[in-house]
């Protein structure tokens, strides 16, 4: 309530940190996407690249995917100092890991007839991939990149919590000082930024899917604008600051990661790794389930296929507002309502899940075949039974994969919610890193890697069953 009305006089002080946030997200997304495009074919199982390279790449991707952008940013500050360079480095790694996995999975599922024909003509594997596989998967690849850009804006907005630049430091400061009118202004600017990026992403996605067309001159201007935006964001980044980078600290860091604290790793106490990881999984699981239950009906209210346009516009706006707020901010807000602990973490991830799941469910509804539903309506069947018998059977596999993906995301987000007192493994990990207790940090990171790997295996089996 104290955020309304926002302090509009504070906008001028927000613009530069907001630019840094956009700068990190744009540069990190483009660089991470580029590296993923170049290296992802080496991870595909059906293209004949050496198995050793494929295994090494997949192990690296698995390790990087185990950590949220905030943890990657905190690690980067020890290497490159404080500032936007560390934040951009973290967003690049985060994007690279996700995009590489998605792309080599798409390549593995693609039709390889054109690829095999080119190989039979003596074309090298990589060139055959470019001409035989890439044209098939590039629309999905670019769509995933646009979705990650929107996600990375929210990630970049909290990297200031660990000194990696952007609007996060300002946001944390104003929340700590209880200046909620200024917090409202910051969140309003983030919301407007997310709205602009989402509209632009939808426009580009429609061009990619050939649902819209533009003239050649307009296409050239669009490419020129995108190139200029990337160059401006890249060449105005802060340079890495190695003046505070201690070689001894780096040696201790890597030694701690290679020789973790095994007593903490195997501890069965309440403050041991096993209990904290279990708490993290429970927070992520319950938050995902609550989010999925709420999101399913909201998705039907969010699309013009099932409700009038004004109703869908209203719900679209509400969901966009929910998605524009960084998850750590929700954690800080709910702590003041329910106090610190795992329950706050569940509330936080439930609300964040509603934002993402409703968006993805709506996209699935917009893409389904509506003819069975309209046929049942024409026969006099009421809308709810018609949805149950014609829509839900089509959506079950898609909804399942979306929910599993969100659970995977929630595991990583739950792993840093402890930073604001919302339970899980986050607080011990960040405190260990800030206190240079690298053996304990190494044990926690190893636990996260194994946890995410196990969840990936379970998710793959569930997905295969669907």
Sequence positions of predicted segments:
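Cytoplasmic-entry segments and transmembrane alpha-helices of multi-pass inner-membrane transporters
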Residues: 38-73, 102, 297-331
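Membrane-cytosol interface at the C-terminal ends of specific transmembrane alpha-helices
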Residues: 82-148, 155, 199, 340-391, ...
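Hydrophobic positions within alpha-helical transmembrane segments of bacterial inner-membrane proteins
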Residues: 25, 29-41, 45, 70, ...
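N-terminal, non-cleaved signal-anchor transmembrane helix
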Residues: 1-26, 30, 34, 46, ...
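C-terminal transmembrane helix and the adjacent membrane-cytosol boundary/short C-terminal tail
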Residues: 143, 181-237, 442-466
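Alpha-helical membrane-interface segments at transmembrane helix boundaries
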Residues: 15-23, 57-64, 150, 172, ...
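Generic hydrophobic transmembrane alpha-helix motif, especially the helices
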Residues: 61-95, 319-350
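Glycine-rich helix-loop "coupling/hinge" segments at transmembrane-helix boundaries
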Residues: 78, 152-190, 336, 412-448, ...
